[in-house]
């Protein structure tokens, strides 16, 4: 099997409200694609996140994990949006992560890998960027 693309579907009860929420989290002003009413898609990190309206979305939440260069910076940025987020958790020598729930209970888990010294991946510590 030669997989050419990955799309993760997330059920939401209100597509417009969810597009505002995901737009803020993904730093986008609008979805990349709206193929039909009640569906919006964002291309992030080489995959597509598809939001689709489903009246029973809150009954079956989905979890999606995203690797980022600096989980601490993303934690601060998303928290500054007024979005309720969990604390940054640490798995010694492996990963730092936190979870955030969308308005329908779907979980986005953001993580950064930790190098041998116990620090972030070293690819981008965000020290030269303002939030």
Name each region found by the language model.
Residues 54-56, 90:
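Short polar/acidic secondary-structure junctions
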């Amino acid at each position: 099997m030669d997989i050419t693309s990955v799309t993760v579907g997330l059920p939401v009860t209100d597509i417009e409200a969810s597009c505002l929420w995901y737009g803020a989290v993904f730093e986008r002003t609008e979805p990349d694609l709206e193929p039909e009413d009640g569906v919006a898609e964002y291309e992030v990190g080489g995959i597509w996140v598809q939001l689709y309206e489903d009246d029973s979305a809150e009954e079956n939440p989905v979890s999606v994990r995203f690797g980022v260069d600096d989980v601490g910076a993303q934690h601060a940025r998303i928290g500054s949006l007024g979005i309720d987020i969990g604390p940054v958790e640490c798995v010694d020598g492996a990963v730092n992560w936190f979870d955030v729930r969308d308005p329908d209970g779907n979980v986005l888990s953001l993580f950064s890998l930790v190098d041998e010294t116990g620090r972030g991946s070293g690819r981008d510590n965000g020290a030269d960027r303002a939030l």
